């Protein structure tokens, strides 16, 4: 019999002695999601910062500025923080794809990624929902049984409202992408547990 060693190269992933696991599908999809998250949150921040308009009407000056609304301030802060997180996660995902080792390759780091993505997604949902409530009242007004009335605002500063609406849509897209990243981390944890048991 020949003593020539036989080398078996795994095609989809590998497991090492430290309960680490690498899957090219996870790494590639993680990098793509991080890039899209960074793009969506950056677009949300930039567009909201541009949401400023002043118009002169027969009733006087009508001004729409994001800084006049606490909900829009929180919106910008939340999206900016998530953008920084997504940018750092993109760098980590890029290094993981090259080195075939990353945060989704080990249980502790995969759990940390899962929790951070969950917190970031919750922050985006909170900020986008609050901003959406303000935007809807500004566009449609509100009448509560004739006692309290908020008149429509967007018929005077259309560009301001359109910009705010576009920023909110971008933020909700970022939330959806973060939700997918959370599911991806959960999938990686499932694969790690399966390979640890087998």
UniProtKB/Swiss-Prot annotation:
Membrane topology qualifier: Multi-pass membrane protein
Membership in a protein family: Belongs to the Casparian strip membrane proteins (CASP) family.
Regions of this protein lying in the Cytoplasmic compartment: 1-30, 95-117, 187-198
Subcellular location: Cell membrane
Name of the protein in its database record: CASP-like protein 1U1
Origin species: Physcomitrium patens
Assembly and interaction partners: Homodimer and heterodimers.
Annotated Pfam families: CASP_dom
Positions in the Extracellular compartment: 52-73, 139-165
Protein keywords: Cell membrane, Membrane, Transmembrane, Transmembrane helix
Chief localization: membrane
Residues that span the membrane, as ranges: 31-51, 74-94, 118-138, 166-186
PANTHER family documented for this protein: CASP-LIKE PROTEIN 1U1 (PTHR33573:SF47), CASP-LIKE PROTEIN 4A4 (PTHR33573)
One of the record's GO cellular component terms: plasma membrane
């Amino acid at each position: 019999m020949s003593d020539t060693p036989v080398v078996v190269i795994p095609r989809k992933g590998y497991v090492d002695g430290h309960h680490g696991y690498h899957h090219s599908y996870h790494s590639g999809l993680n990098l793509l999601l991080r890039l899209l998250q960074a793009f969506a949150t950056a677009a949300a921040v930039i567009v909201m910062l541009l949401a400023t308009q002043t118009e002169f009407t027969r009733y006087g000056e009508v001004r729409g500025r994001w800084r006049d609304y606490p909900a829009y301030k929180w919106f910008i802060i939340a999206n900016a923080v998530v953008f920084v997180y997504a940018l750092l996660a993109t760098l980590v995902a890029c290094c993981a794809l090259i080195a075939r080792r990353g945060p989704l390759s080990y249980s502790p780091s995969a759990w940390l990624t899962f929790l951070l993505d969950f917190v970031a997604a919750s922050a985006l949902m909170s900020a986008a929902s609050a901003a959406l409530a303000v935007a809807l009242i500004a566009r449609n007004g509100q009448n509560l049984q004739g006692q309290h009335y908020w008149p429509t605002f967007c018929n005077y500063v259309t560009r301001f409202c359109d910009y705010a609406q576009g920023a909110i849509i971008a933020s909700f897209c970022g939330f959806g992408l973060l939700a997918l990243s959370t599911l991806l981390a959960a999938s990686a944890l499932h694969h790690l547990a399966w390979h640890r048991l087998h």
